[in-house]
Amino acid sequence: MIFLAVYHRKRRKTSQGEVERRALICYTKADESEAIMKKIKYMAVVLATGLLLAGCEEDETQNNKDAYRQIGINCMQEGDYEGAIDAFQNALDQSLAVVGEEEIDTCYYKAAAQYAAGKKEDAIETYQALINYDKKNAQAYFLLGELYRKENDMDKAKENFNLAAQYAGSDYEMYIALYQECYAAGMQTEGQEYLKKGIEAGGKSAEDYAQRGRIYLLLGDYDNAETELTTAINKKSTETSLYMAQLYEVKGEDEKAAGLYKEYIDENQDNPTALVCLGGMELEKGNYDSAINYLKMALDLDAGSQKQEAQRNLILAYEQSGDFASAKSEMEDYTKNYPNDEEAAREYLFLMTR
């Protein structure tokens, strides 16, 4: 309002003296402006040089951070958890107390390394720090709950799982992960409750329908699963054909299932889940060469949680095809990875005699 009042004030007549005074000021300012421009140009060069040096320092810091992080990951893969902890901490030290997505992800790695190294309390402290930073961090609650579940502290596990579900929003993968954790702990009823929360998340995108169909499939509600998955497919969700194949498989419609698995693999050859499922189906049908091919492809991709199933089926496929040398070699590796599988140990003794 003040600006407007000044702007609209009635102009007064300008005297000749005022005109001359302004001209003198303009002439003086013109001389000064040349000197000022020289100073500005000089300061611009200094500033640009400073920014360039700062940029180089930032690049070096980021490179160091990335290098330490990769060293930590490599150490974990080699079983050197103490080395991994040090590397991840060095990566975090590069951040100078600045917290972003990369730092949070590095903290997850650090906590996993701490737990693997037998430093349970340190891992708990790291997860708790993540929670203190973001009270709605569903992932941190889930991982802390998973730690307590592994330690058979089910009260604390459930407490953190409930908080993870509370803040999961429309993260269907979180609800499914919670179900899987409960299933592993023999708490199927609690796990199903988490799945139901996932259904309640709502949403009408192709991904929403696909994930709800997947959840109904886990709940054994095949009619609703098919309805949701069909809608997702109509909305052009390519991932859904994998879940529909699994639905056909549990319903005993093997031909339909195999067709969808193959169709999915043709477009997504980097998905180990489909490869493991199709490999298992080919094994059951006696198509051993085909089964071996799919299972080896899955293992080459790192089958993750399905690695044990893939490797076990690969051994059976080799054995059934008469390739006992390959079966024995694969079994040697399997028994190292899964020493508590007593059935496999007995099978290994059998293969030793072939």
For every predicted segment, state its role.
Residues 66, 100-101, 105, 139, ...:
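Start-of-helix register in tetratricopeptide repeats
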Residues 77-78, 116, 150-151, 184-185, ...:
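Register position in tetratricopeptide repeats
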Residues 94, 98, 133, 167-168, ...:
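Structural marker of alpha-solenoid helical repeat scaffolds
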Residues 70, 105, 109, 116, ...:
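Canonical tetratricopeptide repeat
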Residues 27, 38-42, 47, 52-112, ...:
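N-terminal leader/linker segments that initiate helical-solenoid repeat arrays
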